[in-house]
Amino acid sequence: MKIKTNKINSANAQIEAEIPRTTIDANIEKIAKNLTKTASVQGFRKGKVPVTVIKKQYGERLIQDAEAEALREVLNKGLDELKVAMSALIGEPNISKFDKSDDKIEVTVKIAMRPEINLENYADMVAPFKKPVISDKEVEDRLEKLADSQGKFVDLKKKRAAKDGDSAIIDFEGSIDGELFEGGAAQEFALVLGSNQFISGFEEQVVGMKIGEEKVIKVTFPESYGSEKLAGKDAEFKVTLHNIQEKVKVEIDEAFAAKMLAGQDDKSLENLRAQIKLQLENEALAKLYNEELKSALLETYVEKINFDLPEFVVEQEIDVSLNRKASTMSEDEIKELRENADKLQELRETFRLDAQKSVKATFIIDALATKEKVRVDENEVMQTIYYEAMQMGQDPRLAYDKYKNAGYLPAIQMSMVEDKVLTQILNSKIKEA
């Protein structure tokens, strides 16, 4: 068996081999002899089946198994020559050539290896930045919102028209072109005016109504509305206002603080303000990270950390982009690409740069996670999916199973690792204002 190897770079290599017919024949003989011990053939006792019978009954399978064994030998010898461990390979080896003739098989195997990434100066690529400053006014505004959320609605002491901030107790019945639609009606529904709970224009038209008043409210569902049957449609709602309630203002004092800090040792108003300030700082920092610093840091790493990329991983990423593009194309456009290989390749090339950046970013994050000792286990992924599902009013178990069955869990886990590792690196560079 002749073998020739070529290590293209640290992430890609190629193995070329000539497998003599004698090697395949020897493999067939060996596999057939082993089968004589286990094969069940009618008319023969187990373990007593002649090799000639085995070859006749399992002919094509024997050839396939013999060729597969020869390919494994090619791969093992090639890796030994390249001094590459099997564990360093990424994905399955790609057999790009398999030409059979009477006396030999000519084979070319392309392999991809986990790239070598130098992270020696990664911490120096992060510029120190100042922690967001929270003003006293921001703390007081949040404190007032907290107090407002604790207020209770009570019936009006003196009758008046409904205004923003009131809870309007209404019956409503919606129709489109005179036809009632599902989910468009309710009785004695408590609607807080100004909460934007209903579609734009509805609450504004309840403002000014008086108890006992009936009114037809006209609105238009937004084009982006969740129900396709309602999106962009004009609708009319028959509304009856039964009652108006106003919110009783909660005093911001030590008693209020004690209620909000129940279970804590320090129940003072001063501590409540301190905790609100800390919460606002964390929110501002998270916003800064998510909207600016994380993406900028990853872009810096992609630009400055250079290493060889496994070709087949880049091609897979291009395939994803191409499939996404194809889903937006017409049948004629897709047909044209199928019939014109040059045009298809030209389109693939438009995705190459972004694909390379995406693959590079993935390997960098993986290497950084190892360096920073960051990991996300399956339980963390489940908790994240459960939390987001509950936030959206969905069944957490069904949401998790949906992602799992669709094969999305690894991508979610990788996204969480990215978020965690970049946050950890950025946290080490915060400067107090």
From Swiss-Prot:
Q: Which PROSITE patterns match?
A: FKBP_PPIASE
Compartments where located:
Cytoplasm
State the top-level EC class: isomerase
Sorted alphabetically, the Gene Ontology cellular component annotations on this record are:
cytoplasm
E.C. no: 5.2.1.8
Notes concerning its domains: Consists of 3 domains; the N-terminus binds the ribosome, the middle domain has PPIase activity, while the C-terminus has intrinsic chaperone activity on its own.
Put simply, this protein is called: Trigger factor
Upper lineage is:
Bacteria, Pseudomonadati, Campylobacterota, Epsilonproteobacteria, Campylobacterales
